Amino acid sequence: MVSVQKVPAIVLCSGVSLALLHVLCLATCLNESPGQNSKDEKLCPENFTRILDSLLDGYDNRLRPGFGGPVTEVKTDIYVTSFGPVSDVEMEYTMDVFFRQTWIDKRLKYDGPIEILRLNNMMVTKVWTPDTFFRNGKKSVSHNMTAPNKLFRIMRNGTILYTMRLTISAECPMRLVDFPMDGHACPLKFGSYAYPKSEMIYTWTKGPEKSVEVPKESSSLVQYDLIGQTVSSETIKSITGEYIVMTVYFHLRRKMGYFMIQTYIPCIMTVILSQVSFWINKESVPARTVFGITTVLTMTTLSISARHSLPKVSYATAMDWFIAVCFAFVFSALIEFAAVNYFTNIQMQKAKKKISKPPPEVPAAPVLKEKHTETSLQNTHANLNMRKRTNALVHSESDVNSRTEVGNHSSKTTAAQESSETTPKAHLASSPNPFSRANAAETISAAARGLSSAASPSPHGTLQPAPLRSASARPAFGARLGRIKTTVNTTGVPGNVSATPPPSAPPPSGSGTSKIDKYARILFPVTFGAFNMVYWVVYLSKDTMEKSESLM
């Protein structure tokens, strides 16, 4: 009985053990099957091929996702790898970006062990992609070196990520009224070319604030500072419908260093140089003329060169106003010198006329006639006296002179003439009449004629001149006669008052400082300094940043 009862117990224990072993084996198999399947799939790319083939089987890339149904939403974001350059002349800017688009296409859902299918650009042409274009783009280039720079990924739930590397040249409208203290908001506008908002819309992937990324190292510009960016969206109406347009505004502020060195400082120095001429003597006409003309030409050159870096706008910029005012100061300095020179010449001419103006004139002809008559009467009395004295001398010394040869007639006659000049000479010296000296020649001639008549021929037919009383008186009388002749010869034409004109007054001198120069030395610098103060305070304190449409 004992042996019969033990056999069923052993059989029961062995059955339980087998059941436990079977459960453990099953659990082990279940735990190892996912790993084995994934390992098999990694080792077998044919599985991916089957997945892709199944996705594209019956897929029509001509139809948008949800065609005839809900609106397709395309989420976008931009990563800027390089910003610039910015051209003021062409009013455009260039940047290099990664442009990302994300949408959901339920036709591309799949079931598989991999969450994301990372594919190359070959898959892009086989599926539907948004027809995004840049509305204000002048030129957009997709990079293809060394292969097309495109990224395409399909997620298990049918979400598509499509990324391209683009270089975009976009238009940037600029209003240069405040140039070069200006700021601009350069837009980048993109949207669908064919699908209106009833079929496709655009949104920002990470929200308006973080969907556009511009690293600091990517925004280093020469003439501008990129101070930020803002985003917005708008709806544009056309004859084909309403379209959603996404816009990114890149806010740029111009750097002034280049323009200060190239334009502002040279203009200020040129104006100061033109005002140096106020301190130069007004008689230095060449020096002041060179100052004026040189500074005017310099300002002309600066104004032309300043416009080379700007488009040909029809309005005046802030720099144009500054250059125009500087040019006005320089030109006014030249006009100021012209005024100084003009008024100085007028003053000198007035002074010369005042000095050279003769005293009030009296009738000259009667006076001269009266003086001439007086002189003739004096000469007549002198001739009579001379004749009387000559006759006395002839009678008193006839015996002595009878032995004198006729050959000495000329010398004795000359001596007699010299003696006859004593009375006229004394009369000329004592006479206050200035015309008596001028008529000395006539007096001498009359005396000579008297001597000739006194020396009449003798009864014997010989010429008997009237000699002087003594021979010692002849030299002195001859010397006096020579002085009288010299006086007559130096007087020139008879009737002249004097051979040497009276000393005239010196011409008026134009030396000294003009009142206009004195006023200009103060007025010009003060006015120019006040202009600079107002100019820089207004423009530096003014908000010259152009407002974007999203902030208006």
Curated annotation (Swiss-Prot):
User: Alphabetically, which GO biological process terms does the record hold?
Assistant: central nervous system development; chloride transmembrane transport; gamma-aminobutyric acid signaling pathway; inhibitory synapse assembly; synaptic transmission, GABAergic
**Entry superkingdom:** Eukaryota
Q: Residue spans with biased composition (Polar residues)?
A: 403-423
Record's Gene3D superfamilies?
Neurotransmitter-gated ion-channel ligand-binding domain, Neurotransmitter-gated ion-channel transmembrane domain
Spans traversing the lipid bilayer:
260-280, 285-305, 319-341, 516-538
User: Biased-composition ranges for Pro residues?
Assistant: 500-509
Identify the PANTHER family for this entry: NEUROTRANSMITTER GATED ION CHANNEL (PTHR18945)
Protein's recorded name: Gamma-aminobutyric acid receptor subunit alpha-4
Which species does the entry assign this protein to? Answer: Rattus norvegicus
Q: Which gene encodes it?
A: Gabra4
